[in-house]
Every structure is written in C-alpha cells, then in structure tokens.
C-alpha cells in the first residue's frame, strides 16, 4: 500500500515538474532582451515582424529566422528595427528603437506593424545592381 501511495506521489510530482518547466519556456517572466529565446521567436515575430531579431540579414537581404527559406526575403531598410521584448506575467511588451512601446496581453495578442509601408520584398536582380555614376561607365 505504501509503495502505491509513494508511486502516486511521485507521478504527481513529476507531472508538476514537467508542467512548471513548460510554463517557464513559454510563459513566466522574461527580462528585457534584444535576443528572445529561440523557442519563442515564432511568438514574438508573429505580432511585430519588423524586429531585427526576426531576421537574418546579409549583404542587404534579410530572410526570416522563423519561417526561413519558405518566406519572402526582404531588403534591409528602415523596416527592420532594433527591438527589445519583455514579459511580466501576462503582459508582453516590445520596446522599439525610437522609444516606441507596444504592450499586449500575452494570451490575447494583437499584431502591430506601423512600419509595414517601409517593407520591400527582395526580387532577384532588382536590388543587386548598383546605380552607376557617369564617371563609372
């Protein structure tokens, strides 16, 4: 009988540990950071996609870190912003480089993208050619 009770207590304790470690990964507190955990990028980049941590940029062309090659590449310009993110309980907050703050309820998130007008999709050969000056002919 004692073995059964100890077994049940052990199962309850282990399920509680799994549940608390899961909530730590996707919930709980996240101090202000320019580099959110890799497993949370999909969340943070879905609601404010212009954050620099959402993009891998090289030679002026950026590819999504979340959706990778399955997404459209973009031209690195004013659309890509330095952002810091933080989470305190159920409040998720973005601090964008111009001291613009966007807060939302983490469990009821809303997309926010005031920089959408600056987004330029990269098209092969369209942005690779430098404009030549007269003396470079």
UniProtKB/Swiss-Prot annotation:
Transmembrane segments: none annotated. InterPro entries: ASFV_fam_110 (IPR004848). Pfam families: v110. Keywords: Glycoprotein, Signal. Disulfide bonds: none annotated. Glycans are attached at residues 69-70, 105. Residues 1-20 form the signal peptide. Belongs to the asfivirus MGF 110 family. Plays a role in virus cell tropism, and may be required for efficient virus replication in macrophages. This is Protein MGF 110-7L.
